[in-house]
């Protein structure tokens, strides 16, 4: 039986079409995925992300532990509330999960991990935390709502009290603050400004209803996927998994190579991969009729005349741009164009950076 978040009843009241998403009953859409997508790009939309797992880590050696556990370096986190995006790797350099880590105090950090990887993540973290004496608390008492879009912060702020409004005033991206019952973070998965707000389960439904009344549109998994793909954001299990290097998933920027003497899980394997080269993640744009879909082959000829084949990891029709876009993992040597096989047709595509839309505007 699939689990329900504390907002399940609100979704059904809002007319959601519910689907099983990695063991959770989640809204796919509330009538129109396209309308929900546009609401986030032009105004404000919200997502139930309570299926994600919040893990609190406490102990005097927490920073030391996370410097070993994660490919990015939490030594960069010096201001309370600052967050960092990182891969959590296995010994062969594959991605166990991608996550966000928040720093509060020297002995208190918070992780937010994916729902699909929850059990293996918790097992991995627990196993490696033991020698460091870390106290691990899984915050199943908290729900999480992401409010995203150009007007999202202003609309969400109408629900905050004076102290909460003051706490978030001028807060830069990738920060989080505990203000009363709310943990408010300037993070998201859409390429728009907004907040991800964690709050006690028993208060989630009232907060959701108040956001609806404030003019924030409920949005489902469908719009979440088209928004994140336009923004060039990876989805675990598609752009990366335990067999794929972060170097092949456009996550090279999340690997902190310096200081050279920091030992983190997967470092040795990554250094070999960096030396020998890996595949890379690119963007694809197809303005002709048709839709680029996951797992379609991508073919190209390199400058030396050699033929290569890659694969689309995520593809969709972009509601913002009005044509099809995709992320693809391909061998080195790809030029500005490639061919994608769609059924029995060979379709020309333009090769771009793996990001298409930022703050409502085309990048590609």
Swiss-Prot record:
GO terms for molecular function: aminomethyltransferase activity; transaminase activity. Pfam families: GCV_T, GCV_T_C. Keywords: Aminotransferase, Transferase. GO terms for cellular component: cytosol; glycine cleavage complex. The keyword NAD does not apply. It is an enzyme of class 2 (transferase). Its EC number is 2.1.2.10. Gene3D superfamilies: Aminomethyltransferase beta-barrel domains, Aminomethyltransferase fragment, Probable tRNA modification gtpase trme, domain 1. It catalyses: N(6)-[(R)-S(8)-aminomethyldihydrolipoyl]-L-lysyl-[protein] + (6S)-5,6,7,8-tetrahydrofolate = N(6)-[(R)-dihydrolipoyl]-L-lysyl-[protein] + (6R)-5,10-methylene-5,6,7,8-tetrahydrofolate + NH4(+). GO terms for biological process: glycine decarboxylation via glycine cleavage system; one-carbon metabolic process. Belongs to the GcvT family. PANTHER family: AMINOMETHYLTRANSFERASE (PTHR43757), AMINOMETHYLTRANSFERASE, MITOCHONDRIAL (PTHR43757:SF2). The glycine cleavage system is composed of four proteins: P, T, L and H. The glycine cleavage system catalyzes the degradation of glycine. This is Aminomethyltransferase.
